[in-house]
Amino acid sequence: KQFFQTGNNLTNAVALSGGSEIAQTYFSYTNTDARGVEPENKLQRNNFDFHEVAKFLDNKLTVDGNVNYITQKLNNSPAIGFYSNPLTGLYFFPRGMNIAPYKNYQVPAAVGGNGAPTQNWPFIEDVQQNPWWIINRNTNEDDRNRIIVNVAVKYDFVPWFSLQVRGNVDRTDDDGDQKYWAGTLAPLAAPNGNGSWNGFQQTLQQEYGDILGNFVIPVSTNLKIDGVVGGSITDNVTSGINFGPGAGSGYGLFFPNLFTIQNIEVAPAVALGGTSGSYGSNVRTDQPYHNQVQSVFGNANVSWKDMIYLTLSARNDWSSNLAFTPDDHYFYPSVGLNFILTKMLSLPQVISFAKIRGSYSQVGNTASQYQTNPVNTASGSATVLNGTAPSSLKPEQTKASEAGFDARFFNDNLTASFTWYKTNTYDQDISIVPLSASGYSSGNVNAGNIQNRGIELTVGYNLINHGPLTWNTTVNYSKNVNKVIDIDSKDGINLVDLTPGNNNYDTYVSKGGQYGDLYVQTLEKDAQGRLVLTPDGNGNYFPVQGNGELNGYSDVGNPAPKFQLGWNNSFTYKNFNLNFLLDGKFGGQVISVMQGMLDYYGVSKVSGQARDKGYVSIFGEDQTTGKTVTEIDPKNWYTFIGGRNATLGQYVYSATVVRLREAALGYNWVVKGSAVKSVRLSLTGRNLIYFYRKAPFDPELTSSTSNSLGGVDVFNQPVARNFGVKLNLLF
């Protein structure tokens, strides 16, 4: 309570529209001013949107233009993990001490030092710092300017054919930095104690253009054909510079807390992987990237008596990322078929509508950039890096099949929708280090056949649908089964580590398993399931580390749920409306590195309870005598299983969670005889109540947007309960 604050998000928007039959104009402005639950975490955003549509030549020519401009400033984006994260010091702080004096996060410079203030904190270790020091002296800032311009020109030559040309430019300029002030502990700041500074300036620009021929052919009264043929080009350019030695590089600032490029230490090339005697600089690094995709495509929709619908599509892409390979292009078709049973068959009157559907599709994806030919990379020295990939890389391909039905009953009061699907993704682009027998340090290969199979079911019913009161309830059910059919058998690769270098866990893709299976260290057990214990010589015991099946680690599950269930209810009564959504994810496993460290430091609730009792209850076996042991010393237990290298097999939790996801209450006023036509006031809430949760954190939170870190808690940000008020005025 002494550190966190109440976050808020204030959004104001105004929109104007007007026009005639010939031209329509739309303009809007949205301002967002937000602050997070951590102090100094702020976001400011302005969004301007202008849209104009005009028709000429007896409405045959349509010109459509849109400009969207966004400015954004983000300060102190919250961190996860051990470093630059105020939660570590906050959570590790002893419960018997008063943290309030440390809000004064810095103290005057020490005699004989560099003259810079130092950090006011009683503990010296790399995984924790003063929380207020981090938010004020380990600051980060990101400024963004983005402009999106869309132009489309369409001409209707005849009633059944039109030609359209479209163009789009999307440019984003980012300018950001991370400052580590003198007094910050290693490895974030330089060993010389003067602090460090890292920054970047980056521009991403995408240019897109296409030409489309749209046709509608009424072959007969019963048979209709419509579709589109065309081609497109997408060009992406990324450029920018980075400056600064980087946290943990061993280099920093010449003079303390002077954040200028001229004050950044220059590292010798040998420190950057170059050769002895060469010159280098880690002040600036150019990052030019350029790729292009050229495409031709077409699709056709055929309908018969508005009861049978056939959809066909085909697309071929040529990608610059596949240059120097035998297959620089990839073709992917699709087909879909729908039958409207209520028009084809004489069904009971209770069936208002019934449709069955099925489809098959292929989707292609290009390889990673600059992976098909050796390139010279400037990395602060004259050294040419030797990472590459073979010229036999192929595009990734996903094949998907789907079938289902949609139905409505009792005058549309009861609705049901069901979908079965199966997807297989082949030839995924993965990095292999080292790339054996190639002469290069690393490279990419095509690998994998990852399958997803599942079902989705939605059932809704209007329980009350007459008079001033209505009530609609909807239930959603979904289930997905993931399986790694193959990785790269032809090259003898049956396992890929997605998280190499982690302290005490790994996520793997292994043949026969699921994507992102969690592997951790576990404790050894005997045939009866008892923990194997070794005496400590003082009448107590230590557990014994197990020998996992993969590099000492054991498979403890996957964070993906077995199934998901949601229940939504919507009520209206005159001008009032109420909505609430309950949902749950059932099954799966997650792990908490944070809980292991809190236990090790003795600041968790369970470690405190164990100290009060004087023991931890276990089911173990003395490996020297074979006798059953039911109690173990808390210090021996938590110092062995906890800490940064925790035995995470003891910190595996069910990922099942059931919550009141959101609720909203609104009221509408209709105003007469005023410039204001209507007023709507809404009260909203999200993450309101947990009905069931066993994990010490929200299982839906991840340590990264990467798929490889799902279900892993490494001092993730706490979940916030959100309340909102929204006012809409229509003039």
Predicted region positions:
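Outer-membrane beta-barrel transmembrane domain signature of Gram-negative proteins
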Residues: K1-S17, E21, R146, W181, ...
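Membrane-embedded beta-barrel scaffold of Gram-negative outer-membrane proteins
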Residues: P395-G439, S478
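Transmembrane beta-barrel strand/turn architecture of Gram-negative outer membrane proteins
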Residues: S20-V107, E141-D175, S196-G244, A314, ...
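Outer-membrane beta-barrel transmembrane strand signature
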Residues: K1-S17, I22-T30, N104-D156, A269-N299, ...
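Extracytoplasmic gating/loop element in the C-terminal half of outer-membrane beta-barrel translocons
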Residues: A186, S319, K585-R680, G685
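Surface-exposed loop/turn segments flanking beta-strands in extracellular/periplasmic regions
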Residues: K1, Y83-W133, W181-G195, S239-N282, ...
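Conserved small-residue
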Residues: K1, A79, T234, I241-P256, ...
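C-terminal beta-signal and terminal closure region of outer-membrane beta-barrel proteins
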Residues: A382-T383, A447-N452, D497-R530, V603, ...
